Amino acid sequence: MKTNIIILLISLVFTFQLNAQTLNKEIAIEGETPYLLGKIDKSGLENENYTSWFTKNLKEYQPNQSVITEISTELKTYTIKLFMGTWCGDSKKEVPRFYKVLEACDYPMEQLTVVAVSRKPNMYKQSPQHEEAGLNIHRVPTIIFYKDNKEVNRIVEHPIKSFEEDIQNIIEKNDYKSNYQIVTAVDNILKKKGTKGLNRKTKKLLKTYEGKVTSMFELNTYGRILYGTDRIEEAIAVFTLNTKLFPNEPRSYMSLANTLGVSGQKEKAIVVLEKAINLHPENDDLKENLEMIKTN
């Protein structure tokens, strides 16, 4: 009996040490800026490599106290997941402000999960344990609010008004629309109907979002996320949609063609680039891209 208790205690200590080791893991490569990766907490952001921006932006932000008073009680009934990058300018600006709002609300930090993601091409906006899997994390920071283990809403990249006002909308009316609504719409279609469903919905999406999407990078970044997680067919479908939404943007065609090329669809890639060159005959990047595809 005593032996079993000792073994159990050793196992618990080992588990605790393992968890402690994986929290606030820093990746430090010679010649590169260090960054946090995986689950982190506030103490990790107060580390010497991050405190210059975290502490400064935390102190400078002054939440609207009247809104804080209105949201603080109800906010405690939600759990929150926050995905960020310590390498990301938006995360450096917005995450300290979000912490300031949570602290002003006396929010229980054990209900907050913070995950730092990578910017490396083979792990783009992913974490080692893939806490982001299936959550459509295409921009950071992304803050997801849960009630009874179900997603209620999210704030993407930056608040529409302010964190406290956006949170108030989410917990009171919940007619809140975060940034990058076209990505949300496309992701929902892919999850429910796949690429065939996206193809069927293309005309409707173009009619709904034409002129409302700020740049080709809204869908382009999302396509990169899909490609990086081996959802190749879906990435190609998204890049194809992007060429229709931004026909005057040569880079939209290059993203599609390069993805087709690396996935063994060389002839289709050539067709895409030749069409783009007909539309943009003066663009040397398209011509170079076509030559590269043809010779590989």
Show which residues each predicted segment covers.
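Non-catalytic, surface beta->alpha helical segment in thiol-disulfide oxidoreductase systems
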Residues: 139, 144-183
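Thioredoxin-like thiol-disulfide oxidoreductase module
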Residues: 111-145, 163-171
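Register position in tetratricopeptide repeats
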Residues: 228, 262, 292-296
